[in-house]
Amino acid sequence: MPDIQPITVYGKGGPNPPRVAIILAELDLPHKVIEVPLSKVKEPDYVAINPNGRIPAIYDPNTDLTLWESGAIVEYLVSHYDPDHRISFPAGSNLAALATQWLFFQASGQGPYYGQASWFKKFHHEKVPSAIERYVKEINRVTGVLEGHLSRQKVAADGDGPWLVGGKCSFADLAWIPWQVIVTAIIQPEDGYTVEDYPHVKNWLDRMMARPGVQKGMADIFPST
């Protein structure tokens, strides 16, 4: 791959910027991070970059593209900078379609519900037990989908796996890590969820968290000691 100018990443920490940081690390892509405090995301300078006023966003000088929404950024990075399909699949293939399916499920099924569960448990100004119960049920439902699917996937001859798609770790798996790990630090067993009830998911997360690229991408959430 020819020389690549550093990609600018706006925002760090929280559940969504690490999804992008993990992909950048896994693909060894040069980048620089500009911190955007949550108190600044609705100010004109940042809204000019992301009109939705959320993090992350990127600017890629190699293609002169500004892009926001972490799922769209993940898709963009692997389509442009993973020609050897280290963590992706050939464009137009069934495996590529399946990987996109899991990415969309993460965006629609994991992110909103896990975020609401975390909000009502940790940040809402008053306790609303019915809201916590509703969203924790969704965490269990979504994690149950992952558990069932992983339990049916084959393990490679070298012992690697199981993975969501194609017998290898791909962006389809990696996109799930931040929220799936963060929620275990906020939602406690007494709230009705523990990853220990999902052994295939726990093993899957442990294997991903052992990857250097994942450790680097998650460092803002869980710094090494």
Swiss-Prot record:
Classification via InterPro entries: Glutathione-S-Trfase_C-like, Glutathione-S-Trfase_C_sf, Glutathione_S-Trfase, Glutathione_S-Trfase_N, GST_C, Thioredoxin-like_sf
Keywords recorded for this protein, A-Z: Transferase
GST N-terminal domain boundaries: 4-85
KW Transferase (keyword) present: yes
Domain of life of the source: Eukaryota
Tissues expressing this chain: Specifically expressed in conidia.
CDD domains: GST_C_Ure2p (cd10293), GST_N_Ure2p_like (cd03048)
Protein's pathway: Secondary metabolite biosynthesis
A GO term from the CC aspect: cytoplasm
Signal peptide extent: none
Protein EC: 2.5.1.-
UniProt domain GST C-terminal: residue ranges: 92-225
A GO MF term: glutathione transferase activity
UniProt cross-references to SUPFAM superfamilies, sorted A to Z: GST C-terminal domain-like, Thioredoxin-like
Task performed by this protein: Glutathione S-transferase-like protein; part of the gene cluster that mediates the biosynthesis of trypacidin, a mycotoxin with antiprotozoal activity and that plays a role in the infection process. The pathway begins with the synthesis of atrochrysone thioester by the polyketide synthase (PKS) tpcC. The atrochrysone carboxyl ACP thioesterase tpcB then breaks the thioester bond and releases the atrochrysone carboxylic acid from tpcC. The decarboxylase tpcK converts atrochrysone carboxylic acid to atrochrysone which is further reduced into emodin anthrone.
Family as reported in the entry's similarity comment: Belongs to the GST superfamily.
Protein name: Glutathione S-transferase-like protein tpcF
Gene: tpcF
